[in-house]
Amino acid sequence: RNAAGNRESAQDLSGFKEFFDKHSDMDLVQLSQCRSIEDVIRGLKGSAYYEPLEKLLEQGKATLPACETAMDMLYFKTIWKIKDKYLSKAEAKMLAQCFGTKMDMLNFQWICRAKKYYNLSEGDIYALIIPIQYHVTKKEIQTMAQAENMEQVYGVIKNSWYKCQNIEELMDQGLGNAAKELTDKIYELTSRKEPYSAAVLNSYLYFKEREIEQIITTIEKIRYGMTART
């Protein structure tokens, strides 16, 4: 974000240097000194992140939101690809439940945002969403991408597989709330069902990530003088 805004980094990242030197190909300190998105992407050369970001750069589409979406795509596709390789059958199934639900919910939200706020074309929507479906069918994705209004999109969501998970009732407080409720539920259920497996660690990390997101949101609201309800 500092690079995108051409701002100098004020954070001292030296405390993370040893960890990144051991576990990563990235030079975190050098990256923190970059003053543009282009510099950041070039600084990632040799890492797994470079190729998808370099493609955006070549297309002239290397904006901060586009880069964030590309990283989300890489994350989910990588997890989905390696889960069967490194995990037992039971653990892979558990991970599929958690990440599959998370991907479905994100695709619902991204499609709604694309239709409601940006009026993106069908092709642009396909490029935006995660190309993996769990309980959502390709036909449902296509119907939402081709929908003429938001009511049609919401209709598909409410009548999807997640209907049996009461998504319509949860959507009374917004799709974002429904997505969080359903995803939280899956992570909680898998950890309780398999208390001596990787499901517990997976659930722990998920809820820690949620806590961090809430802390960041709170800090940003304080920083920009926003109220708690904003």
Label the model's feature ranges.
Residues R1-T230:
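Extended alpha-helical surfaces
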